[in-house]
């Protein structure tokens, strides 16, 4: 039977009713494509492709959907974005949820409604997972976004000069590229819960109303793909930390070192807490009792005076010890305190944002009280303070090696201000005040943006300075425990070989056992000319390029303000020189490594 005969055996199709013809004439290309796919799917499933089904399924508008993106450094932005997505789905809105590390930056051009929750790192830079999108939007290949509606929630820390800078930058750039705001940007501080909840409620109400105007059919409730779920880490979390015991506190810098770095071991037995190399440990701490007494004496407040803190009525001394931030000054504190001090100099400082930021960075809260005395009630003073927040430390152990323990590498923050010795809140608690077998409240903070390759045969290059070596100890422990075939290369820097070689004997043993294949050390103060890790990177350009050609993953951990930037500049020089690419090509190559998760950074 010929093809012509086969065609003639089918009965003729009835003509389309006028109302269907009218509807079809108004469809654009995207709607025609959708309709074609829908009809084909219906026919393939054995459903009738007749007109009644077509009439029922025919859309009168594009499906109303929202993309919710997060760019997180410590997990807070991800958590807020997850809740926002859940809230929108509960309102019957179709949601596409993604972390920026899993999102193709070029897809931004096709978005119609976008919510972005982003933190800020370093000196106002976007989180690592947002770098590629940030560069695209600010580069010469930036797409037009005139069909996009958006809203941005920024998370930050007001004690830093560039508060919520990443959120502000994205918000501004979206508008410059033609996008329209759904809602004004919100900048949330460390105690972000109330601001984030209000933003989520407002955007959900707005989008629900817009969806109704578009007569969109509410989307069915859907379970997000398994890959987007946060893996359970046991019942303990930031809000309900595990009361762990301190096993060991060992100073691992020499007596003559300018640094005080501690190797901390904590017992997780009975917690069911699990972590992976690259994760961080959240540590809740109490302030120094001596600092609490100093502050109360300066203010003339009776330690037994009761105030509200953490939903309880507590003596102010207890409240300041466990519920309020006392070691990190903020612009909000200085501005709030200035009227009580009634001092012209402090008023001038508070009125000039640039001067204020410098003052906040250099002057602890207690020293503000010393320099500008004032009398406040206990409630008034507490009202100027932020809630105490846990500190996050890169985990320096692998559970494959240490079992129910977790190890940290903690640099104790110590300095003098106007002759008075000061120490960091959490680092001082761990280094000085927490006794062996004492209790420390902890939780695991996942960091999926800083992971070993899934293929353990892939080589890795680890670049860090100071306590930035911490996660690399965990990496090599894990690779050794798995007897991984992949080569490991450590590039580490610190001031002095004799005083600051963190975990020296362990690195030597790893090398002897065949799990540290290459190593380069930069001791910046051991010779007249300062040598840093970026110098070692340039020195080893040909070798690094060869490892990259073999599929190596590069990891950087340490200071975001200077070290990480200098390392990236050195890597670009390697790509230009050894890879024979121009500057633009080198940038694109590094962006490709980022998107392939072969260039990951944990910087702070």
Curated annotation (Swiss-Prot):
This is Sulfite reductase [NADPH] flavoprotein alpha-component. NADP(+) binds at residues 524-525, 530-534, 566. It catalyses: hydrogen sulfide + 3 NADP(+) + 3 H2O = sulfite + 3 NADPH + 4 H(+). CDD domains: SiR (cd06199). Residues 239-453 form the FAD-binding FR-type domain. Binds 1 FAD per subunit. Binds 1 FMN per subunit. FMN binds at residues 72-77, 119-122, 155-164. Component of the sulfite reductase complex that catalyzes the 6-electron reduction of sulfite to sulfide. This is one of several activities required for the biosynthesis of L-cysteine from sulfate. The flavoprotein component catalyzes the electron flow from NADPH -> FAD -> FMN to the hemoprotein component. FAD binds at residues 327, 361, 391-394, 409-411, 424-427, 604. The lineage of its organism: Bacteria, Pseudomonadati, Pseudomonadota, Betaproteobacteria, Neisseriales. One of its GO terms (cellular component) is cytosol. It comes from the Bacteria. Its EC number is 1.8.1.2. GO terms for biological process: cysteine biosynthetic process; hydrogen sulfide biosynthetic process; sulfate assimilation. It comes from Neisseria meningitidis serogroup C (strain 053442).
């Amino acid at each position: 039977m010929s093809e012509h005969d086969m065609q003639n055996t089918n009965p003729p199709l009835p003509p389309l009713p006028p109302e269907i013809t009218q509807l079809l004439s108004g469809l654009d290309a995207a709607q025609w494509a959708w309709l074609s796919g829908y009809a084909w799917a219906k026919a393939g499933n054995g459903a009738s492709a007749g007109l009644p089904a077509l009439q029922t399924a025919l859309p009168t508008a594009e499906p109303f959907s929202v993309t919710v993106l997060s760019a997180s450094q410590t997990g807070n932005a991800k958590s807020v974005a997850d809740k926002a997505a859940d809230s929108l789905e509960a309102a019957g809105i179709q949601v596409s949820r993604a972390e920026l590390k899993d999102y193709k930056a070029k897809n931004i051009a096709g978005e119609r409604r976008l919510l972005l929750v982003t933190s800020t790192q370093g000196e106002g830079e976007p989180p690592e997972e947002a770098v590629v999108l940030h560069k695209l939007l600010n580069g010469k290949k930036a797409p037009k976004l005139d069909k996009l509606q958006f809203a941005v929630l920024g998370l930050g820390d007001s004690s830093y000069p560039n508060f919520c800078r990443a959120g502000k930058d994205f918000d501004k750039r979206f508008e410059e590229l033609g996008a329209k705001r759904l809602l004004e940007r919100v900048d949330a501080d460390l105690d972000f819960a109330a601001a984030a909840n209000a933003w989520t409620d407002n955007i959900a109400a707005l989008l629900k109303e817009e969806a109704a105007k578009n007569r969109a059919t509410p989307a069915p409730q859907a379970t997000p793909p398994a890959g987007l779920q946060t893996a359970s880490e046991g019942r303990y979390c930031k809000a309900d930390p595990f009361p762990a015991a301190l096993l060991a506190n060992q100073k691992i810098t020499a007596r003559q070192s300018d640094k005080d770095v501690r190797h901390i071991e904590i017992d997780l037995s009975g917690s069911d807490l699990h972590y992976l190399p690259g994760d961080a440990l959240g540590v809740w701490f109490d302030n120094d009792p001596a600092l609490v007494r100093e502050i109360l004496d300066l203010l003339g407040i009776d330690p037994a005076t009761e105030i509200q803190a953490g939903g309880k009525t507590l003596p102010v001394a207890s409240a300041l010890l466990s519920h309020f931030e006392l070691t990190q000054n903020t612009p909000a504190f200085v501005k709030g305190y200035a009227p009580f001090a009634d001092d012209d100099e402090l008023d001038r400082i508070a009125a000039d944002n640039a001067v204020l930021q410098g003052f906040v960075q250099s002057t602890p809260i207690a020293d503000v009280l010393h320099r500008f005395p004032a009398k406040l009630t206990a409630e008034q003073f507490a009202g100027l303070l932020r809630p105490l927040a846990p500190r996050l430390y890169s985990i320096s152990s692998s559970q494959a090696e240490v079992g129910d323990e977790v190890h940290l590498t903690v640099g104790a923050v110590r300095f003098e201000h106007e002759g008075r010795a000061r120490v960091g809140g959490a680092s001082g608690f761990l280094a000085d005040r927490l006794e062996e077998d004492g209790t420390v409240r902890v939780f695991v903070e996942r960091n999926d943006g800083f992971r070993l390759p899934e293929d353990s045969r892939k080589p890795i290059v680890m670049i860090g300075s100071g306590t930035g070596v911490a996660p690399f100890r965990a990496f090599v422990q894990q690779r050794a425990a798995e007897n991984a075939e992949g080569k490991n290369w450590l590039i580490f820097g610190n001031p002095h070989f004799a005083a600051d070689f963190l975990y020296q004997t362990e690195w030597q043993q790893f090398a002897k056992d065949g799990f540290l294949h290459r190593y380069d050390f930069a001791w910046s103060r051991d010779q007249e000319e300062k040598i840093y890790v970026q110098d070692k990177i340039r020195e080893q350009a040909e070798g690094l390029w060869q490892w990259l050609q073999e599929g190596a993953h590069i990891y950087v951990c340490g200071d975001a303000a200077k070290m990480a930037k200098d390392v990236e500049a050195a890597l670009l020089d390697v790509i230009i020189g050894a890879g024979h690419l121009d500057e633009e090509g080198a940038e694109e190559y590094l962006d490709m490594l980022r998107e392939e998760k072969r260039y990951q950074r944990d910087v702070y």
